[in-house]
Amino acid sequence: MMNTTFAPPFWLKNPHIQTILPKFLVKDTLDYERHLYKDSLDESDVAFDYLLADDVLVDGKYQKPLVVLFHGMEGSSQSHYARTLAKQVQTAGFHFVVPHFRSCGGVAVSGKIFYNAGDTAELHHYLGILKQQYQTIYAMGVSLGGNALAKYMGEYGTDAICECAVVVSAPVDLASASIAMDRLLGKKIYTPYLLNPIIKKALDNQITADEITALKRAKCMGDFDNIFTAPRHGFVSKNDYYRQASALPYLKEIVKPTLIITAKDDPFLGVTAERGDVSSQVVLLTTEHGGHIGFIDYDYATRAFCMDYIPKRALAFFEGCV
């Protein structure tokens, strides 16, 4: 287990401050170049937002590495973690892209299928599109996208298209994460923030009168997953979905270098991976603090918040994989 210290000042150690504050700190706006592609089902358009580096094409492919970010639930290229990572990737001289899951990034779905935490076929499809254009691909996934990427790395093994992966704040055991989210603060603060937008999108989609009634009564993510996510994506119940979509059982099968970063105080997570749960190609980096995709520090010399802990760990890991 890697021990790379993350030690914020005492007044930043609260997990809820770590989780909520980044949304208000990141002010940079980035000029992404957007391309639309069809999803793996050839039903819906999905948006890929690129930041390109100066590069040359050799045999039709860019030679500098591409860093791919798989966003979290209801995330996008405008999420604070995407913009923070993008700046570091630009500084390193690499290409950057955020492929959005179906219905995210402002592009509505055309079919009945949205996205879920275990849809590795969709990730493989996205990476396949990118492999046609880029010689070297590194991938990072956060939260829901982190679980999907970790599962992908184990499920696809040597066929995984990216050279290596970094997984951050991932609910690799979805059932226990669902329980964690239903605790008092999670239910009062985080659940409405995540649940309300996705319910609104679902209500705008092709749904029955019974589904509409049930969705309007949903009070937690478990309700939504039982009513909508599970049946829409071929699972018989939320428990079936959580069991099949969780990355934890697949971590032993990972054969390409993978770094999993988790804060012990993450309010979104339940059971997390331990050394005996993963293959020899997986590095576990566990910090005492950091919240959920937070990891905010403070530089007293410059009197500024620092949000580069995760991007720096990720880029160092990618460069070490070469």
Model-derived features: positions:
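N-terminal cap/lid segment of alpha/beta-hydrolase-fold proteins
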Residues: 11-60, 305
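Alpha/beta-hydrolase-fold enzymes
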Residues: 133, 138-233
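Active-site nucleophile elbow and catalytic-triad environment of alpha/beta-hydrolase enzymes
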Residues: 227-250
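Catalytic active-site module of serine/aspartate enzymes centered on a nucleophile-bearing elbow/loop
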Residues: 290-322
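Short amphipathic alpha-helix adjacent to the substrate-entry channel of hydrolases
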Residues: 80-98
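Short beta-strand element of the alpha/beta-hydrolase
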Residues: 63-72
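Short beta-strand/loop motif that positions the catalytic acidic residue
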Residues: 254, 260-262
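Catalytic nucleophile-loop/oxyanion-hole region of alpha/beta-hydrolase
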Residues: 86-88, 102-138, 304
